[in-house]
Regions:
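Non-catalytic signal-transmission and effector/linker regions of two-component phosphorelay proteins
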Residues: 1-13, 20, 120-134
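Two-component/phosphorelay signaling modules centered on CheY-like receiver
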Residues: 21-39
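Active-site beta3 strand of CheY-like receiver
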Residues: 54-60
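Receiver (REC) domain active-site loop signature in two-component systems and cognate sites
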Residues: 65
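Short, glycine/charged-rich "phosphate-handling" switch motifs in NTP-dependent
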Residues: 110
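A Lys-centered signature of the CheY-like receiver
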Residues: 115
Length: 134
């Protein structure tokens, strides 16, 4: 699968905000294998710093993280005056309750997947969401 490229011809950039090193490695390998440039943050606070400092095309966000959870990360980012406030966000978590889905929507997620997720799902949702801005 070839990533959709912006007008300047560089690969699309994805920020993974996830505390699990294994999950970060999995998403990075899947997305880099599809031609995307990937950066990582270990929690919501680090994610905010990176999202506000560098241009990205997509956020992949876990919910349960130390220092700042994924919902708080998205809420804070969505309230910012930065271009990052409109980045599409894919929440991937182990939480499968309907109230978690509603909380993700309220926080500003564009889509919500429950772990475990397949490589094909990660690639497909990334490709679709990078064509969308909030």
């Amino acid at each position: 699968m070839t990533p959709i490229e912006p007008a300047h011809g560089l690969p699309k950039r994805v920020l993974i905000v996830e505390d699990s090193s294994l999950a970060r490695l999995y998403y990075r390998n899947v997305l880099e294998g599809a031609g995307y440039h990937v950066d990582q943050a270990m929690n919501g606070l680090e994610g905010i710093e990176k999202a506000l400092a560098e241009p990205f095309d997509l956020l992949i966000v876990d919910v349960n993280m130390p220092k700042m959870d994924g919902f708080s990360f998205l809420q804070l980012l969505r309230k910012s005056d930065s271009d990052a406030a409109t980045l599409p966000a894919l929440v991937i978590t182990t939480e499968a309750e309907s109230e978690d889905l509603q909380a993700a929507r309220t926080a500003g997620a564009n889509f919500y997947l429950v772990k475990p997720v397949s490589e094909s799902d990660v690639r497909a949702y990334a490709a679709v969401l990078m064509g969308v801005r909030r």
